[in-house]
Amino acid sequence: MPRIGLIVNDGKPLAVQTADTIQQRLELAGHAVVRASSSGGMVGFANPDQHLRLLGYSACVPEGFNNSMALAIVLGGDGTVLSAARQTAPVGVPILTINTGHLGFLAEAYLGDLDRALEVVLTEQWTIEERSNLVVSVMRGDQRRWEALSLNEMALHREPLTSMCHFEIAIGRHAPVDIAADGVILSTPTGSTAYALSAGGPVISPDCPVLQLTPIAPHSLASRALVFSDREPVTVFPATPERLMMVVDGSAGCYVWPEDRVLIRRSEHPVRFVRLVDHEFFQVLRNKLGWGLPHIAKPDKG
């Protein structure tokens, strides 16, 4: 029988306990289980005094994970899902996300659905939804100094107690544009409901083949979010004398210096989500973000 992976946020006792239960049930059904910690996908932040992450993004793949696996079950919150995406996308392993955290916007199932989810897994009745993924690379000349995959977004912004920044941004073959702001966000459709949404960007349906550029606290009224084809690679040149902070999906990043440039392109390795039922994106927006709910009736003026 095909092997099944388990990716667990081992910092959460509930996730570990649930993983033990799932592993026992899968092994009783005859499946070999390969277990890994989600910490392997949390690249972390590279400090100036540390060596930057010179390895490619495939270095996050756990030992024993490859494209012969049927799927990997992910236990944790949305942060765990973002880490698991880095661990599985390079080898094409689909992920079934079971939430043991808070909001669970990226979760396919909750603990109350566990029995039904395992039944679907054992009978192989799931479907696959692919989500676009980014490769984020920091370059200095011809040298790659840092690289990671990103399911949500890359945010490049100033440090505290520093001035407003300028960014020269080239999209594809087009001439660079200058943006004056506290920072910029480059996001996928999946990431449009995350940091980019808080910065004033639009919500984008995940089946749209686009990327989104959103300024953070822009200086100009003309600086607004831009949506464009994801076939276009993006290069961000820091046009400011101070170092900047780059954060990818909230759990990875490094400092970017004036002599560096950030390259962002769509990855050839999408994140493959296991769907137990038909996935209706607008219903997810309604249930988890309150989109489109009726306004609360105003109180009567007595």
From Swiss-Prot:
Top-tier EC class: transferase
InterPro entries assigned: ATP-NAD_kinase_N (IPR017438), ATP-NAD_kinase_PpnK-typ_C (IPR017437), NAD/diacylglycerol_kinase_sf (IPR016064), NADK (IPR002504)
GO molecular function: ATP binding; metal ion binding; NAD binding; NAD+ kinase activity
Principal location: cytoplasm
Catalysed conversion reaction: NAD(+) + ATP = ADP + NADP(+) + H(+)
Subcellular location field: Cytoplasm
Listed PANTHER family: NAD KINASE, NAD KINASE 2
Name by which UniProt lists this protein: NAD kinase 2
Organism whose genome encodes this protein: Parasynechococcus marenigrum (strain WH8102)
